[in-house]
């Protein structure tokens, strides 16, 4: 039998499966699990879900702190889960929050930076004394819902301007991934 493919998902609440209903629960059928179920028809999969609600690409939140800064924790997470065959990064949504005041290029560059960290961390199949690195892919987060522009929404101020910026993310990220060879 062939070895299982070890796939690590590095994401935020969108990958964690957060239900935006105020209860803090998660979807039973999250996309990482559905992906692994689909891929298991082709090969054996060990899914590693490293998904944390409120995680940013490379920003420490002024309220939540540095534990949610994806850049600060990525290398240790990769090394702790080795061997890893493939890393899927889906971050950037929380960088759209108004208090971070980021433009789309800052967010895209931060996402590409996470891919570069992954490509330089020896967490692949070769073991502790190998330079093998996992493959990496970036999944662009979905556009923010128009509810972010509804002043009656209790979190509208937190997400002010996020909808418009999120519409630019896919195209800008695709161009950056092409330039970076991702």
What function would you assign to each model-found segment?
Residues 1-52, 60-61, 76-81, 87, ...:
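Serine-esterase "nucleophile elbow" of acetyl-processing enzymes
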Residues 55-74:
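Charged, often glycine-rich, active-site loop that binds/positions anionic groups
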Residues 14-15, 53, 94, 142:
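Catalytic metal-binding/acid-base residues of hydrolase active sites
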Residues 26, 33, 62-65, 101, ...:
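General N-terminal targeting signals
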Residues 2-3, 43, 68-182:
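Alpha-helical cap/lid subdomain in secreted, periplasmic
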Residues 16-19, 56-60, 95-99, 147:
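A short acidic, helix-capping loop that chelates divalent metal ions and anchors anionic groups
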């Amino acid at each position: 039998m062939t070895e299982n493919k070890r796939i690590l998902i590095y994401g935020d609440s969108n990958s964690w499966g957060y239900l935006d209903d105020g209860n803090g629960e998660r979807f039973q059928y999250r996309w990482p699990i559905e992906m692994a179920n689909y891929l298991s028809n082709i090969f054996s999969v060990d899914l590693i879900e490293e998904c944390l609600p409120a995680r940013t690409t490379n920003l420490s939140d002024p309220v939540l702190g540095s534990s949610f800064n994806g850049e600060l924790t990525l290398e240790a997470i990769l090394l702790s889960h080795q061997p890893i065959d493939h890393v899927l990064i889906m971050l950037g949504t929380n960088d759209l929050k108004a208090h971070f005041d980021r433009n789309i290029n800052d967010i895209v560059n931060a996402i590409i930076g996470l891919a570069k960290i992954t490509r330089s961390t020896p967490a692949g199949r070769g073991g502790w004394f190998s330079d093998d690195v996992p493959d990496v892919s970036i999944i662009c987060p979905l556009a923010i819902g128009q509810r972010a522009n509804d002043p009656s929404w209790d979190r509208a101020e937190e997400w002010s301007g996020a909808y418009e910026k999120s519409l630019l993310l896919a195209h800008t990220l695709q161009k950056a991934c092409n330039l970076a060879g991702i």
